[in-house]
Amino acid sequence: MDEKKALQYEESKRAEEITDIELVSVGGIDVEKKYGETKRALKSRHVQLIAIGGCIGTGLFVGSGSALSESGPASLFLSYVIMSFVIWTVMNALGEMCTYLPLSGASPITYIERYVDASLAFAAGWNYWYAYVFLVASEVTAASIVIEYWTYAVPTAGWIAILLFLVAVLNSFFVKWFGETEFWFAIIKVIAIVGLIILGVVIFFGGTPKHDRLGFRYWKHGLAFREYIVKGASGRFVGFWSAVIKSGFAFILAPELVIFSAGETEAPRRNIPKATSRFIYRLIFFYIFGSLTIGVITSSKDPRLLNAISSGASGAAASPFVIGIQNAEIPVLNHIINAVILTSACSSGNSFLFAGSRSIYSLAKEHQAPKIFKYCNRWGVPVISVAVTVLFACLAFLNASASAAVVFNWFCNLSTISGFLAWICVLVAYLQFRKAMILNNLWETRPYKTPFQPYATYLTLFLLALITLTNGFTVFVGHTFTAGNFIAAYITLPIFLVLYVAHKLWSRNWSFGKRIEEIDVTTGVAEAEALEQMYPAPVPRNIIEKIWFWIA
């Protein structure tokens, strides 16, 4: 009976697909065209800047201050190195799968269902969606806190409403508008971080009004690895591991921004590899060098930093970058950096709303969510998905009646662990994809290849599993246990499990993943190759264009 039910479920899915499809000819090949399809309007330069700019938010500019104060500069730096490796591996896995099969409306959810299991895709898909909801809420909350650095004239709820309306509008019209907005937001963030790193070098060598050569002063006298919660070597390890977990928020669900945009990108087989292959250099420069700069210019025991964290201070007041600049007695820059932080929070909220709406849109296309979420307006935007994501992002209004810092930390914890679970699912899908491609003698035909596989994936899976299971370990250390912190740290795990089991019960498909020989690695490839022919590579006419085409 169970097998019959599972067969009926699969047949109903195929029947729905048939009623939603018409065929058009592209390059002489019949290609599926879904009604209400998104449109490929994002260009290479949009994808390149989304790859790095969309994820640079409050985690790096503000959230790093908490990790610095608790763990010390060396722990902060090493935590960013470790998380950069994790992100690089996840990006490579997604890049290979997406470049091989860049279907319209495809997402990580598509590949998890195709290569692993429909139930895992269901759980991962909804996990993606509510993680992005939390991220939109957290970035909007952060932006409202940043504005309060200048004025309290408008209530917090007012700023949250204005910012939610702004990102909703940017995500409701041409996707090109979203791409252009993120392009310029990202340029501002990149220029700011480059400037801050250069300024950090100047401060390091004493080129400030005080002429005080800092060097690695704040790494000495036992401050490099600070004791946290408990004393001695155990305390230093607790501090280090706490920094690793907290640093995850600065990166969380960043690789997926590129993959969610792939279905709306011109020439995805050319532009997605370009974005993913250069991601490692951006990680090294912006995140690793950025965290090193923070540890050089700001002491983990700085009174301003500690007071800002304990009081839930707003924006630049809690940014270790700004505190280091103020200590160097450089005027005005604190307001400039606060403006950059505000831009970053708005930009990240905008990007996360885009990804969240595409998550539920992709779920609907995979028949894992109501059909209404597949509806796209005449500009190719899934407006129902956007509206529902914005509606739930109104959780940010909790900030109007609770401590901003407390609510911000709740959202950080929930979204971070959801992101870790999503990455585990992606890497499992990649290993299945790899095995199926090898079995079908197609492994060497994939258009984009990444190094150190599958070993990097196995190591990253181990790290992610360890981080996920221990993310709330500090509540068990010393006398710091609180029910709120415990729930925030681990509530995502039972939610994910309930989603997975519920789908198994509904579909009556009790297999734990597809057998390798059952995995389809050919359907859709001809369409992808035909699509590639529609977008010939641009030929540079001069040295300036050659440089620009390399960058973007």
Curated annotation (Swiss-Prot):
Gene3D superfamilies given in the database record: Amino acid/polyamine transporter I (1.20.1740.10)
InterPro entries referenced in this protein's UniProt entry, alphabetically: AA-permease/SLC12A_dom, Amino_acid_permease_CS, APC_YAT
Key word Membrane present: yes
GO CC terms: endoplasmic reticulum; Golgi apparatus; membrane; plasma membrane
Extracellular side: 70-73, 139-149, 206-239, 300-335, 400-410, 479-480
Stretches assigned to the Cytoplasmic side: 1-48, 95-117, 171-184, 261-278, 357-378, 432-457, 502-552
Keyword terms: Amino-acid transport, Endoplasmic reticulum, Golgi apparatus, Membrane, Transmembrane, Transmembrane helix, Transport
Membrane topology annotation: Multi-pass membrane protein
Localization per Swiss-Prot or TrEMBL: Golgi apparatus; Endoplasmic reticulum; Membrane
A Pfam family recorded for this sequence: AA_permease
TM ranges: 49-69, 74-94, 118-138, 150-170, 185-205, 240-260, 279-299, 336-356, 379-399, 411-431, 458-478, 481-501
One biological process term in Gene Ontology: proline import across plasma membrane
Main localisation: Golgi
Function noted in UniProt: Required for high-affinity proline transport. May be responsible for proline recognition and probably also for proline translocation across the plasma membrane. Also functions as a non-specific GABA permease. Can also transport alanine and glycine.
Family stated for the protein in its record: Belongs to the amino acid-polyamine-organocation (APC) superfamily. YAT (TC 2.A.3.10) family.
Name this protein carries in UniProt: Probable proline-specific permease put4
Native species: Schizosaccharomyces pombe (strain 972 / ATCC 24843)
